[in-house]
Amino acid sequence: METLGLPLPLFEKILFRLDPISLVMMKCTRRSFNSHISEDPYFKSKYLSGVRSGLLHISSFGSKNLFCNPFGDSSSSRHHDFLDITTRILGSCSGLLLLFIDGLCVANPLTKRYRFLNYSKSMFLSRVDRWGILNFDLPSEKMNRLGLAVDQITQRFKVVCMNETETSDPDETMYQFEILTGDSCWRLSATTITCSASVLIMDKKPVYFDGSVHWLRKDGSILSFNPETEQARLIPIKFPLELCAVANKFLFSATEKELAFISATEDLINVYALENALIDPKWALVKQIKNGVSENKKIRYWNVAAYDGKYLVLWEMYKDIYNGVVHGYDLRANKWGVLGSVPSWCDCSHSFYNFTPSPFSSTIELNKKVDVRMITTVRDDYNVRMITMVRDDKHISTLKKIMKLTDEISPCAKSRWH
């Protein structure tokens, strides 16, 4: 590989210090640079190990107000934008976002690539009404059935839609899985799993870890599905005893190394890691943190927002103060700091997503030019109608604003590279 006359270790040391946006620009300068950056597994692994996440948050039911807070930067006033179309964030994985902007969309904000996904062939997401109009048919409260997965080797993405089905036994639930590949082809997996009856926790997002999408159920067990191998399993685990003992807040999340569970009271925050998932699963307590941010008597609401193994995030709303506050705990420095704010009109239905910029994800699948007019044929019992879904300037401008806002994370992502 060309290294501009520099020894390879020194050249890589320079690349490791680049923020994600600068690294993407470097890939475009020479073909040999692009090959080394994109294809060398050692380089990708070491570079990503030094990239820090940021935080995206928006109303769980969709909003035109999107907020972004880079970890380690408390200048929150500039990390907010008004979108042109009501948007929901449904997932974040390996630098990609799964969005709902009048339809499903996968985007890599760093590379500015995106793709609107055709859901007309989905068994679980589409429905033709009596007028022959194709509609997206997933109620707001069931949006957590959708999960985003990115293959860590090929960097290709897949979207998984999980469907719950009742069985003849009222004490059992059967789960089905539909998979969307990058070419917008929906396929019903032959895999089903039947297990003890329980429901998903509505306000808990699915979590991607180690090739699989994981859903937390109300009985504490975890449903897992790998879209590559199409293997499904139920992890028979209960909530930690501390969660059952007192009324508190909790979060289901993942780090680079493990699935994680956070439970918090006004005094103490417990961090758990899942151990022995295949044999004897249990939540092992790995850290306790003093809750130093929810002591204010004027707080009307607070909760755990996000966790990635490096930062723990809490947010709180006050009774008499205009804006709420987003707090971050740096687990390496063992200290709290302010990440940003939340407007006073936000209620408890506010969703937070860790977002880590990645110059590697789905460069092929999202490199295609998006056709702004998608025509879908819908057939019913009486006629055939042509339905035109227009991706107009407002859809594109909404995406551009999301991408521009997440650019705020990139300069901070490598600011503490060692």
UniProtKB/Swiss-Prot annotation:
Query: Which InterPro entries does this entry report, sorted A to Z?
Result: F-box-assoc_interact_dom, F-box-like_dom_sf, F-box_dom, SCF_F-box_component
Q: Which residues form the F-box domain?
A: 1-46
Query: Which PROSITE patterns does the record match to this protein?
Result: FBOX
Q: What is this protein called?
A: Putative F-box protein At1g20795
Species of origin reads Arabidopsis thaliana
